[in-house]
């Protein structure tokens, strides 16, 4: 099959109407009406959705924890592929505009809509079960239905335990929508979420998900993450005097943001390759870009998740007329002599234990690192002190409770690259179907107060209306035609990604030219263990790794993507910065890099990020 001429059809099937009504006598009233044996035939497609006549009828229900909600009677349906071709589909629960338009209250006024954050669900399709909130994404399931296959599904819904009194009298009206295409190699789910290496956590770390209102403790074995849906695994650490309390708490317990000290995102080990025409390599158009890839609007980076026994060393390039090949496993997943199953990335730019201090911390190692949203990032600190602050997190007697099972450190440049490449894959914002065109680029943080997690609500640009236009959790539900203004600043376009990788402050990374210390505070030449920094031997990014291209470092491979800065380190400016700052124009972005005019010394616009490498 010619992948360039694959036919795609948008199929909307009114198989489910979901009504949730809050009232003084009934917190939750849910009735799901299905249309029995709905069949849609378009060209080679022949899909049949079958469902029993009885639906769910929940009356006089109260907001409940997930454990209780999962005991509700399921609504059952099936999806049958009667055609001779395999189909890839995504199943979304979206607003039923027709039902909303016809909805009136007993007084005759239009119905007020219930916030999607108030609706929790569990969906089972075949042998897959996933629990989530309608605020996570409108997509509730995805997959491949093989030719002549029937997949049975079950859906349970309940009211979020955190629903407040303001929900009284409001309604939610929804319908299921199916998007389907002929199955091609672009949708190889054998390389998807099932192959993700399970996050390696220390005993002090708590797995979390966002319920639409707050971060809550989650079950590590049931729906914690789903990389196919842009839900990357998140974990936190809390204050020492709160740890035992949260460890003993039930699944679904809200984590008070004041108790959180660090937040982390798991980047699983993967291999990648980049498509091109033999001269330029801007990624592939694939299923997620509506134009041919260019430097200004690059395409998809092919990614496949691999075990830590796999270390591929191909060219990381292939012709876009062929199947993906020449895979390369990023150097970020090697720490010294250890091959890692993944790495934990600080979710936000680093802040300090005294964010009200000058520059959010200043040039000292006396403060401790925090990683959380809505605080001032730690700036005006030289690279030597950044290095020491990174080591402190997992050092003996640290305040966070980390053991020797973890190795904390300042982010290397290749580790930045690992996050950037995953964001440009189908598992990151590039693959998030709620964003199209130029909105595929990670939104810029234009906060002139350097507040972590902020979003301008659009990619980097020359606008000078600085500030924190949207906080990181703004509009966490994205619907057709409406982009998530806050979550668009994350690497996934969901709340589960990494923030502050475009704008905010420049981020120092441990990338250096020929061991030159300059103003960093290190002695010269550098005597650091090589596992803590990347050494570059040439100011030409295509020759910087001992005369060769630095594959996986997001340097020459992705130079100028999204028109981001691309200035390499040199003898004059030996230390590397990433991401851009709040007042950078179009040059700010996840692929942006620059040689630091501060020479590794303190800068009022320079912050840093932290990484945790498991050594279990």
Predicted regions and their residues:
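Short, polar/proline-rich extracytoplasmic segments that appear immediately after membrane translocation
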Residues: 2-67, 170-172, 177-184
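Extracellular adhesion/glycan-binding regions together with long Ser/Thr-
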Residues: 3-4, 61-67, 125-152, 156-158
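Surface-exposed interaction patch
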Residues: 19-20, 29, 67-128
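C-terminal, structured domain-capping segment
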Residues: 71-88, 92-98, 139-184
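Extracellular structured ligand-interaction cores
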Residues: 74-76, 171-175, 205, 259-269, ...
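N-terminal module-boundary/linker segments of secreted carbohydrate-active enzymes
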Residues: 185-325
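Short aromatic-cysteine micro-motif
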Residues: 254-261, 291-501, 614
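C-terminal, surface-exposed recognition/capping segments
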Residues: 414-417, 438, 444, 448-466, ...
